[in-house]
């Protein structure tokens, strides 16, 4: 009888230990916040504001979805790019993309592709020539950023070096670009 009781107790303890085993939801690797002037939580959202054309007033807003509105730290910063970099983003914010723990931003009116860290601190910028036309939208895959250019091209850019590697001619005035199963689709 004692063997049965011992076996039953062992099985109950095993069941209880399995029941209380769980995974932590805070195992995400920390973001690269190097150079930040603002303390930011792990969960964050960036919102690209286009601004008014020809006015150099595009911006990036920051929102902390899990932070209490009464928290002493801001859960919303209207223009985090300006706060972090002490300069305006540029003319006509067009597209924003998170890729490989960085944020890439197309500023169409200023003909720029910006690479920001996860705290919106600028790390690199690529200026497009007037013959390229203004950049519009982007997609990313395998360490490359693909940018549609108003001149009728798609530029392939190395995401780490921010150097243009190649161009592909497409129809005039391409807009959206999407990567799916190793193929790019341009509209």
Task: Spell out what each predicted region is.
Residues 2-6, 13-45:
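Bacterial Sec-dependent N-terminal signal peptides
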Residues 32-37, 88-98, 132-142, 172-181:
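Repeated scaffold domains used in trafficking and secretory/extracellular systems
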Residues 34-67:
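An edge-strand/N-cap motif at the start of beta-rich repeat modules
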Residues 45-55, 98, 105-109, 147-151, ...:
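Conserved beta-strand positions in repeat-built beta-propeller and related beta-rich domains
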Residues 54-62, 111-115, 153-155:
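Structural motif
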Residues 66-68, 117-121, 158-162:
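Short loop/turn segments that connect beta-strands within beta-propeller blades
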Residues 71-88, 120-129, 163-168:
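A short beta-strand motif characteristic of beta-propeller blades
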Residues 158, 164-187:
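Solenoidal tandem-repeat scaffolds enriched in leucines and small polar residues
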